[in-house]
């Protein structure tokens, strides 16, 4: 019997992805360095976000290097800055370090002002390579899904958790959505588009969507 594939149905990669001791070491490294950190205004261990991003990357066909980069994508920004990037490169290689660096919007403390930092990151992301875009898009998808969940639970007060407030946060994720979609439509970017669309609907609409 001939198998029927639905039009536009996302297809999982058929390539077998092997995760070995390096991935386990990366998980331990991430758990150690993010120990005590939690998601915004919650008791959820931060490692849950990193695991979620790595899962999305693997589901989209990313290899072990990209899954490791997903686990470590915040370790420079939140756990040590530029010296930490050198440690990532030493332990996990140049490709992983390049993606982690590409997903970092600040490697100094205190961080630069929010708006300027996000605008700079968006400019950087437009020219980033495909590996970085994949991991970054997975990160943003996981973030938007978390915002959606929290919005359903507590409503408009969710925006007080973010430096950009309501308007800044919505602007940031709308802009990122557009950057990713201009580059490629894949499993993650399609899901990000839908998640941002849902967030816009809950928050009162996107005046710049033009019917998106």
PLM regions and their residue ranges:
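Active-site helical microenvironments for divalent-metal-assisted chemistry
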Residues: 2-212
